[in-house]
């Protein structure tokens, strides 16, 4: 492709909307253009990157025995209602775009395809003899993100590869899950990315087990915790650790103490010389469940620990037997709306009486009590006395009505000891999620009553797996991991072009003819090459070449009269001055080993 004919509009200044390097460089390099909030157009260079990534994904998925298909983007509401996910995905802060057709039928724009593919499987896969089946697609997805940001990292429209496998038993599902794990590792390696597999929460997709693949980058939205012995890695949402030991609180029987206006852990510790680990922190949340119930939560943690809201949501789901649609802290205005004025915020204890909810207008009249294991293990503690300006000192769980059931609700943190090896400790890194695989079990097949006939002639529900890769996000993650102060440094396998021939001065006939000759020789050798034949200044061309990040550059300049060119490797900026025939041989040796 001749650059003079390429739709290439580069920017010298950093667009104000772009916060992270990869977003800035894709905009400046003419790869993408913003159309609206979270909506981007893929320009020719970017589309070639997307196609190269997709080709690698297809190759590995086909090798793993998966079959490509294409499912509809418009989903009838009935399918999602059958699975029980329609309300959660469309109400309140749900992420599904939804609409009505002219007959008043509700439809959704697919953020994911479990419902559609499970429905099809129930119709088409009748016998165990047809199993296992693994179907995948590469398609545009839609999610109504509350706050689109970082370009393609968190958009409202994006390209994704999603796959769904169907099995006769759990063992077969686990085999395919492991095969897909290996396929994903090969995909990311071939794309030139350092991706870390980590234990992950299954989130709204659900299922028994899941694993994310994280590209490590300072701009990553996710915090991942890894053991320094290299044997454990998890998203912080899922991570476990051994917390530091609490400092014992020595004392006699429980006593009331006056703590006027001392409503925070920090203030209490400064005023009385306590350590945070000697206090109980009580939080109030409200959870909205999929059966319409608004459930108040009373959460107790050791004072030096932080709440992991994902773990809380999962615990509430298990305890209530319902899907949690929304979970957030209770604010003073929430209490006012409910007509509740008897809760002394800042002085609450783990034993706050349910009677304070008596006047609640829409909430249930009883707390769901959730106590973290660090709090449940405390012998004596400082906690709120459930009346203004009062705390209890040397309280025990017996004083508070008995030991609570222990849950894991705390955030694991860097520096803490690992559960699997007390000698190992957690370190933290930022990560960009580019892939996620799930063992769904029978969650969707049971909800949608999709069955097959087993060897015994009886019908049973499918075992299912789900496997996703964010293709467009992966492309930007590659830029985040591979760039320098001059621009993008694409890994060779996913670069839009393998090489670019840059003629410093197209007005010089010798340079122009040699550049043309080298370009045609590269094309004849099967190299996907660019030829910068623009009548621009050499400095402009070199800056553009650095910015767009083509892995190899052949510079035809003032030494062209001697038949000498420069061969430049973009990743390390190494320059070789070679006779043009030798430069061509060296480039072909590298690109076609």
Swiss-Prot record:
* GO cellular component, as recorded: cytosol
Q: What is its main location?
A: cytoplasm
Record's subcellular location: Cytoplasm
* Similarity comment text for this entry: Belongs to the class-II aminoacyl-tRNA synthetase family. ProS type 1 subfamily.
> Which organism is this entry from?
Synechococcus sp. (strain CC9902)
Task: Tell me what this protein is called.
Answer: Proline--tRNA ligase
- What's the name of its gene? proS
Comment field on protein domains: Consists of three domains: the N-terminal catalytic domain, the editing domain and the C-terminal anticodon-binding domain.
UniProt keyword annotations, A-Z = Aminoacyl-tRNA synthetase, ATP-binding, Cytoplasm, Ligase, Nucleotide-binding, Protein biosynthesis
């Amino acid at each position: 492709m001749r650059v003079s004919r390429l739709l290439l509009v580069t920017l010298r200044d950093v667009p104000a909307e772009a916060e992270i390097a990869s977003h800035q460089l894709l905009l400046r390099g003419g790869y993408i253009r913003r159309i609206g909030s979270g909506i981007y157009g893929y320009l020719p260079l970017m589309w070639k990157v997307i196609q190269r990534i997709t080709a690698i994904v297809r190759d590995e998925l086909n090798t793993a025995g998966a079959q490509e298909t294409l499912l509809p983007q418009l989903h009838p509401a009935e399918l999602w209602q059958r699975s029980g996910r329609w309300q959660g995905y469309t109400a309140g802060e749900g992420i599904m775009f939804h609409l009505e057709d002219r007959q008043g039928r509700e439809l959704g724009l697919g953020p994911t395809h479990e419902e559609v593919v499970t429905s099809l499987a129930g119709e088409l896969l009748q016998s165990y003899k047809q199993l296992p089946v693994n179907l995948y697609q590469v398609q545009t997805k839609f999610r109504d993100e509350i706050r689109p940001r970082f370009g393609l990292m968190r958009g409202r429209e994006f390209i994704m590869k999603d796959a769904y496998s169907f099995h006769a038993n759990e063992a077969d599902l686990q085999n395919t899950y492991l095969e897909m794990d290996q396929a994903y590792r090969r995909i990311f390696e071939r794309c030139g990315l350092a991706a870390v597999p980590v234990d992950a929460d299954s989130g709204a997709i659900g299922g028994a087990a899941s694993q994310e693949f994280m590209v490590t980058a300072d701009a990553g939205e996710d915090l991942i915790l890894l053991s320094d012995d290299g044997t454990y890695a998890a998203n912080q949402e899922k991570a476990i650790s051994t917390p530091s030991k609490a400092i014992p609180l020595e004392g006699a029987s429980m006593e009331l103490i006056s703590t006027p206006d001392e409503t925070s852990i920090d203030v209490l510790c400064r005023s009385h010389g306590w350590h945070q680990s000697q206090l109980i922190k009580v939080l109030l949340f409200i959870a909205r469940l999929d059966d319409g119930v608004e459930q108040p939560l009373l959460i107790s943690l050791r004072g030096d620990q932080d709440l992991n809201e994902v773990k809380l949501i999962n615990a509430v789901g298990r305890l209530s037997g319902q899907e949690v649609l929304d979970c957030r802290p209770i604010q003073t205005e929430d209490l006012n709306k409910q007509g509740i004025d008897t809760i002394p915020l800042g002085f609450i204890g783990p034993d706050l009486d349910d009677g304070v909810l008596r006047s609640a207008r829409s909430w249930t009249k009883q707390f769901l009590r959730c106590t973290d294991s660090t709090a449940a293990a405390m012998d004596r503690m400082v906690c709120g006395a459930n009346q203004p300006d009062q705390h209890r000192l040397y309280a025990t769980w017996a004083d508070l009505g008995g030991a609570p059931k222990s849950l894991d609700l705390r955030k694991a943190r860097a520096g803490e000891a690992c559960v699997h090896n007390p000698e190992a400790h957690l370190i933290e890194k930022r990560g960009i999620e580019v892939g996620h695989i799930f063992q769904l079990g029978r969650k969707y097949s049971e909800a949608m009553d999709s069955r097959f006939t087993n060897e015994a002639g009886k019908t049973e529900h499918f075992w299912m797996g789900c496997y996703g890769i964010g293709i467009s996000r992966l492309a930007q993650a590659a830029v985040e991991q591979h760039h320098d102060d001059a621009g993008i440094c694409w890994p060779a396998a996913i670069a839009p072009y393998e090489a670019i021939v840059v003629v410093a001065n197209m007005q010089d006939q010798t340079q122009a003819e040699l550049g043309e000759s080298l370009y045609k020789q590269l094309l004849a050798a099967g190299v996907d090459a660019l030829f910068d034949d623009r009548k621009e200044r050499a400095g402009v061309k070199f800056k553009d070449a650095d910015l767009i990040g083509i892995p190899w550059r052949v510079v035809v300049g003032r030494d062209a009269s001697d038949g000498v060119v420069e061969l430049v490797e973009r990743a390390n900026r190494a320059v070789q001055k070679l006779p043009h025939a030798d430069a061509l041989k060296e480039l072909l040796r590298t690109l076609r080993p």
